[in-house]
Amino acid sequence: MSLLSKSKGEVTYKDLSGFHKWFLIVLVSMGSSIIYTPVYLKNVFYEPLMQGLGCTNADLGALLSCYAIVAVIAYLPSGIIADKVRMRTLSWVGFGATAVLTFIYAMLPSIQMLYVVFVGYGIISILIWWGTRFKIVRLCCSESDYASKIGVSYSIYGAAGLIVGLINTAIISAIADASQGIQILLVFLGVVIAVLGVLSFIFIPDFKGEIDKNTKLFSLSEVVTAIKHPGVIWACLAYFFVYLVYMGVTYTTPFMTTCFAAPVAIVSVVGLIRTYGIGLIAGPAAGFFADKLKSPSKSILIFFAASVIVLAAFMIMPREASMVIPIAVLVVLLGFVTYGAFSIGSSPLTEAKVPMSIFGTASGLLSVIGFLPDTFVHTWFGGLIDAQGADAFNTIFVALVVFAVLGCICLVMTRRAMKKNAAAEAESAN
């Protein structure tokens, strides 16, 4: 059977070949990694990007916060749009427009123009593209398979990010001038993202039931229904803390440079492994644990507990150059547990049995609340480093420990709400 998007009419996952389903999961999983790479370049190439743009720690944080503010506004309507517009349309348009913005970014414009570019990234990559990833994975499998499939999806996300990141590292390492290196890197990313747009246009089919043609584009009642669904709000708050800790861990990059005088090459490689490479095993491992424990929430609780232990180790270890390797190992370990939690962070929505009719809306709500940390954490932590230097990192790590504990509390409340709802349904059935 043909893979071409328009060759079959409307289909379900049962109508697609195994190869086609996995091709689509790979496509959107790669895309979810690469489409956001230009925005989050600082997570790996912190120093080269700051030099190339000629800005401060606070400037980098402010750019990302600007993006995040737009993103937070766009997350909920992105989920609603994902319930009303074809995945194929959202995917290829999102990729194509992001590629255009990346080519503008590659010109290294003024900081004022960069704010415009990052606002554009927020509108395009979130409002248009964001809802496609979770929903296409969900459309390509049964409800019971979602936790394991989204775990594998994050593994593919990690693999794609690692491969692209290694190419980016080679570009930065080969070119002495930081500005020129960043420009070439961004042009490369723009081309790759454009190719993903073409593939989406050709191969994503029209899924049966992916949109409801009889309802209006925006329905406040669907938002209210999603909010009222037992466990959804607690799951959203839990995801807020999962993402807050996950993003906070990116500051292990300047931590290694500032406190241990680690060479930029080592820091970049460790950053790549922490951000992408570890996902090759962390995503599937998290999905495996969730299946074995029969609860994504329990798995995330375990990952939170492990992250607290590693963060505590950061605070008590001596800050000497000889400790670079042990610290690098701990950074990778921390990347594993936080990535694992992040990779299945949306799974409590299926655990809460959110119906498909409002799944996109619930995912949008999860994103609005869950990704709020991007609006403040980068400016906050970047400002701390500018003001306090090496002393800022203990403050950052203490904050992350507190956030992990609060996340555990939210997960416990999520499970309580789900159990209470299940008991009520069982009682009404009898």
Residue positions per predicted region:
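Juxtamembrane intracellular "pre-TM" segments in multi-pass secondary transporters
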Residues: 3-18, 207-235
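Extracytoplasmic gate region of multi-pass secondary transporters
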Residues: 42-46, 161, 230-283, 342, ...
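Helix-to-loop junctions at the C-terminal end of transmembrane segments
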Residues: 74-86, 282-295, 385
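Cytoplasmic membrane-interface "Motif A"-like loop-to-helix N-cap segments
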Residues: 84-95, 291-305
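Cytoplasmic helix-loop-helix junction between adjacent transmembrane helices
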Residues: 120-155
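Glycine-rich segments within core transmembrane alpha-helices of 12-TM secondary carriers
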Residues: 147-172, 367-377
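C-terminal membrane-cytosol helix-exit motif in multi-pass small-molecule transporters
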Residues: 190-211, 410-415
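C-terminal transmembrane helical hairpin of 12-TM major facilitator-type secondary transporters
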Residues: 296-345
